[in-house]
Amino acid sequence: MKYNSSGAMCASPGGDQPDKHKQPKNGQQPPDKQPKNGQKQPKKQRHTKRFTAQEEALRVEAIVDAKERDMAARGRCERCWHNARDGHCICAHLEALRFRLDVRFVLYTHHKEYYCAGDDAKVLAAVAPDAAEVFVYGRRGDDARLGAILRGPCAERRCLLLFPDDGAATVDSFFAAPGAAPVPARGAAAGAPFYVVVVDATWTLARKMARHLDRLLGGALPHVKLETDVVSVYARTQSKTGRVCTVEAVALFLREVGESDELFRKMVAMVETNNRALKHEYAKRRADLWASGPTMGNPAWYYAMRVDEGVS
């Protein structure tokens, strides 16, 4: 017998024995290759090119350099990443933030989000340049700088990663743990700021980046999740529950640790300002920006509730 194109057995001139040298096209195993004793059928191997750390760093740097050249060619603003040439720059509508708390933000960004106008984390860096800095995952030198900045605060529990994995602590339980340092007020005598790390990427990539941060810092970076009933105003709705954008996550964390409601509202308003620019700049692609589906790629994935426009 032989297998036809549909995987069924058909008559063979050579007799009734299965052809052991030809695999069925639909991926099924021939009878003599079927797993026995309830064993699972082996998965088809995916062949993906693996880069060395140096090759990956060079690849990411080339991607970032190409994006920077494209930004200049298209007339995009280097601060808000919107098209300034066509009048969509939002910098004039962004109010500088003044924090009561002495906090620093590390925006660990995937190169796919870097220089993407729809990304919201860049707005935080634009309005608080002294308190927020963008680091690109995989770019040469960024990991070394990141490690140098965070190792001390991690050792003193003055640092956390907003990341809602299974082992993440709540904000209350993190600060209630022995040795945890409270978020100091700006200008306090101690003079040691508190660091908040956020991963700016799609959920699949964010998990990989979070694991990389754990390796970089020897597992010393605590993971913390938020508990809130506020829903997202982010421009792109999510395919899964538990998603709001980076700026909203930071705003809600700050409110939980004592920042003012006024600053919270200003940060949410920044996301809305970014949304309005997207609605004009990408009017032809609006369906893509607002569609919800299993392949939607954006970094708004922080919470466990249904995501919709508006704030409750």
Regions found by a protein language model. Give the residues of each.
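S-adenosyl-L-methionine/SAH cofactor-binding core of RNA-modifying enzymes
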Residues: V127-R215
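Intrinsically disordered, low-complexity repeat/linker tracts enriched for polar/charged residues
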Residues: D16-Q23, Q28-Q34, Q39-Q45
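N-terminal chloroplast transit peptides
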Residues: M1, A8-A11
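Short Cys/His-rich Zn2+-coordinating modules
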Residues: F51-M71
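Short cysteine-rich clusters marking metal-coordination/redox-active sites
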Residues: C77-C80
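Glycine-rich, flexible N-terminal cofactor/catalytic loop recognition
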Residues: K67-E68, N83-E156, A181-R186
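Short, acidic/turn-prone active-site loops that include or flank metal/cofactor-
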Residues: H111-K112, R139, D166-G167, L226-V231
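C-terminal folded domains that constitute the principal catalytic or ligand-binding module
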Residues: A189, Y195-V196, A201-S312
